[in-house]
Amino acid sequence: MCIRDSLMRADHTGITMVNIGVGPANAKTITDHIAVLRPHAWLMLGHCAGLRNTQELGDYVLGHAYVREDHVLDEELPLWVPIPALAEIQVALEQAVADVTQLPRSDLKRVLRTGTVASTDNRNWELLPYPGPEQRFSQSRAVALDMESATIAANGFRFRVPYGTLLCVSDKPLHGEIKLPGMANHFYRERVNQHLRIGIRALEILREQGPDKLHSRKLRSFAEVAFQ
C-alpha cells in the first residue's frame, strides 16, 4: 500500500493498494517499479508468524527493526547497513490502530507490540534442524517473522521512500498454533477488514500532515541533496 499521485484526487494524494503476493523476490520487483513513481510513502500490511508465546492470533506487530534473511537486496544494500524506523510513520500507524480499534492507550499494548521483524526467503524455516534460523531470530529478539517486510523496508531506505510495517499474527508455529484451513477462514473474516482500515487510516493521518513532514533526513546521506 502506498501514497502516490492519483488522478482520482485533485490534490494528487490518492491511496493505491498493491497485492505483492508471497516472497521477497515479488516484494523487491514490485517496490523497484513503484519507487519510480516517487510515492510519498509505502506501508507493508500483511500476516506474520508470532514468535512470542504471549502473542495471540490477531495481535498486531509494529516493526521497528528488521532481520534481513531475505537475501534479495544483499548486493544493492549490504547487511551492515541498518534500516531505521521512521518516527513519522511509526506514530501514524500507532495512532491508526488506536483510532480503528477504539482501545484506550492503556489497553493498546495488549493488541499492539512494537519489535523486530525477521524476514526469510525459506518458507519451511521452522523445519530446519536446530540451531538454525530459530536461534538467530531468538538472538535478534524478533517478535514476528514473514517473507516480505524487510525487503520492502530496505527498498524504501534504498530509494528514499518513507516506509513502515504493520503485521497481524496469523499463526505461532514455534508454539504449536499453526494456520489450519478452518482457523484461517475465521481469522480472515475477523481481521483483514480491520487491518486494511488501520492502514488506510495511517495514510490519511500522513496525508493530513502533508508531504513535507515525511521527507525524513534519515533517508539521506550527509553528502546528498534533498529530492522527491
Predicted regions and their residues:
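Metabolite-binding pocket within alpha/beta catalytic cores that recognizes anionic/polar moieties
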Residues: 4-92
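Zn-dependent metallopeptidase/amidohydrolase metal-coordination segment
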Residues: 150-187
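Active-site rim beta-loop-alpha module in soluble metabolic enzymes
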Residues: 80-139
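Short acidic/polar active-site loop segments enriched in Thr and Asp
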Residues: 40-41, 143, 162
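Short glycine/serine/threonine-rich phosphate/pyrophosphate-binding segments
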Residues: 25-28, 147-152
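His/Asp/Glu-rich mid-to-C-terminal helical/loop segments that flank catalytic regions of hydrolases
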Residues: 173-227
